[in-house]
Amino acid sequence: MKKGFTLIELLVVVLIIGILAAVALPQYEKAVEKSRISALFPIAKAVETAQKTYFMANGSYSNDMSSLDITVPLPTALANPPCSLAHESSDSSRQDAQTVVALNNRTSAKSYFVAAARLTGPYACSGIKIPMTDVGALEAGRTYCYEHIGHFTGTAGNFCQRLMNGKYVTSFDSCRFYQLP
């Protein structure tokens, strides 16, 4: 009697491995993207705290990263941050190849945000925004997930609802905002 596996048994094993890979790979990619965005939370919160400190000392919010009492661990300062993040100065953001953190201020509209976004991947130009003041339906100090309508290539809610478990709040300024749990 010969010992070994039959062709059918080998095909069944290959089929099972294929099914497991088809299920596991999208979940793995989702976990990687969520961890990349999660890495921006502490940076955005630190910039928010620095903005609050600046406001307490000066009575207004800063438009310049260099005037805040913080060093953002991203190397490049940009005059025009990507993803249509508003800017009021040439020192309003920091970025590397994959992420950007910006003082997303529009003093004329009295809207002041700290924004952090991904620049690459399936959720490019999506990220988190923290309003410094109440803006429409958005509450000051609460962290919101956002998808920039003009740059986001995915289905609405794909990033903020499905990946970040956000609840839709409002749309304005070319962004969909979702409240994070």
Predicted features, each with a name:
Residues 57-181:
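Periplasmic/extracellular, small/polar-rich flexible segments of pilin-like filament-forming proteins
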Residues 31-32, 40-58:
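N-terminal alpha-helical signal peptides/signal-anchor transmembrane segments
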Residues 1-32, 36, 40:
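N-terminal single-pass transmembrane signal-anchor helix
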Residues 8, 16-19, 37, 43, ...:
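Weak global preference for isoleucine
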